[in-house]
From Swiss-Prot:
It is a multi-pass membrane protein. It is found in: Endosome membrane; Golgi apparatus membrane; Synapse, Synaptosome; Cell projection, Dendrite. Disruption phenotype: Mutant mice appear normal at birth, but develop severe skin and gastrointestinal tract inflammation around 6 to 8 weeks of age. They do not survive beyond 14 weeks. This phenotype is due to the lack of activity of ITCH E3 ubiquitin-protein ligase, and consequently, prolongation of JUNB half-life after T-cell activation. This results in an increased production of T-helper 2 (Th2) cytokines and in the promotion of Th2-mediated inflammation. This subsequently leads to increased number of circulating, esophagus and small bowel eosinophils. A motif (PPxY motif 3) lies at residues 74-76. Highly expressed in embryonic and early postnatal cortex (at protein level). Widely expressed. Hardly detectable in resting T-cells; up-regulated in T-cells in response to activation. Activates HECT domain-containing E3 ubiquitin-protein ligases, including NEDD4 and ITCH, and consequently modulates the stability of their targets. As a result, controls many cellular processes. Prevents chronic T-helper cell-mediated inflammation by activating ITCH and thus controlling JUNB degradation. Promotes pancreatic beta cell death through degradation of JUNB and inhibition of the unfolded protein response, leading to reduction of insulin secretion. Induction: Up-regulated after traumatic brain injury in surviving neurons around the lesion site. One of its GO terms (biological process) is CD4-positive, alpha-beta T cell proliferation. This is NEDD4 family-interacting protein 1. The keyword Transit peptide does not apply. The chain crosses the membrane at residues 117-137, 144-164, 173-193.
Length: 221
């Protein structure tokens, strides 16, 4: 028993020398490094560094305008003046830029027509009365054809008024109403003259507009 106690007492110093004390992980090991990683305070930035950072901000991200500038709107006169200046052409038009025309082109010539179409529609409206007038007026698209139809219908109206007035087959149509006879007679005469006069004016248009810029002509029948 005494020998066992003596052996145990001899082994304890040797084992105690091999142990190592461990640190607690929750305790901070190096507080100096944590303090070193923190950013410096604003008071430590010098005046030159502050000016440098202000310059960088102004160049990359410009500051917005002040409240007075942002909320100031132009007056009504200024807005109208700006709108007027925007509509003014940069290069004003000049008359010499347009090229004169020696004669009407094919489309204008088709729109005006010729004497043959005028005479054809004139006799159609004169011989076939209102049926010939509607056919010749609707089937032709030229001014000569339509003016010929109007003139022929006017002469046809005069023809039938004279037939009814002086014929023995239609007695009593205008008894006591001679003003109505005169109204239809004057109306037919005006239609006849209008067709001839307007067609004569249209025929002179190629000569009138030969030296003028290109112009659209609207025929009102």
């Amino acid at each position: 028993m005494a020998l066992a106690l003596a052996a145990l007492a001899a082994v304890e110093p040797a084992c105690g020398s091999g142990y190592q004390q461990l640190q607690n992980e929750e305790e901070p090991g190096e507080p100096e490094q944590t303090a070193g990683d923190a950013p410096p305070p604003y008071s430590s930035i010098t005046a030159e560094s502050a000016a440098y950072f202000d310059y960088k901000d102004e160049s990359g991200f410009p500051k917005p305008p002040s409240y007075n500038v942002a909320t100031t709107l132009p007056s009504y006169d200024e807005a109208e003046r700006t709108k007027t200046e925007a509509t003014i052409p940069l290069v004003p038009g000049r008359d010499e830029d347009f090229v004169g025309r020696d004669d009407f082109d094919d489309t204008d010539q088709l729109r005006i027509g010729n004497d043959g179409i005028f005479m054809l529609t004139f006799f159609m409206a004169f011989l076939f009365n209102w049926i010939g007038f509607f056919l010749s007026f609707c089937l032709t698209t030229s001014a000569a054809g339509r003016y010929g139809a109007i003139s022929g219908f006017g002469l046809s109206l005069i023809k039938w008024i004279l037939i009814v007035r002086f014929s023995t087959y239609f007695p009593g149509y205008f008894d006591g109403q001679y003003w109505l006879w005169w109204v239809f007679l004057v109306l037919g005469f005006l239609l006849f003259l209008r067709g001839f006069i307007n067609y004569a004016k249209v025929r002179k248009m190629p000569e009138t507009f030969s030296n003028l810029p290109r112009t659209r002509v609207l025929f009102i029948y």
